[in-house]
């Protein structure tokens, strides 16, 4: 999704590939995959981001996701 990142493409690809492998291992359909990924994102936000920044970061993530789908 991000166009500019402090992380390497290799780091991102490795994590994404692992996550895809887990979803494939469980034969998760698209809706279940999206629910799981949404729960993961919510968990990361609520446990790792200060409450004062949580909503703004969630909105930025949502906007980035929408833009990624639009430009596909």
Swiss-Prot record:
Top-level taxonomic group: Bacteria
Protein name, as recorded: UPF0352 protein HI_0840
Similarity annotation: Belongs to the UPF0352 family.
UniProt organism field: Haemophilus influenzae (strain ATCC 51907 / DSM 11121 / KW20 / Rd)
């Amino acid at each position: 999704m991000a166009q500019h990142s402090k992380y390497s493409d290799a780091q991102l690809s490795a994590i994404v590939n692992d996550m895809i492998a887990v979803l494939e291992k469980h034969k998760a359909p698209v809706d279940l995959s999206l629910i799981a990924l949404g729960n993961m994102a919510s968990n990361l936000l609520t446990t790792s981001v200060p409450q004062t920044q949580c909503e703004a970061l969630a909105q930025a993530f949502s906007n980035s996701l929408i833009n990624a789908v639009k430009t596909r």
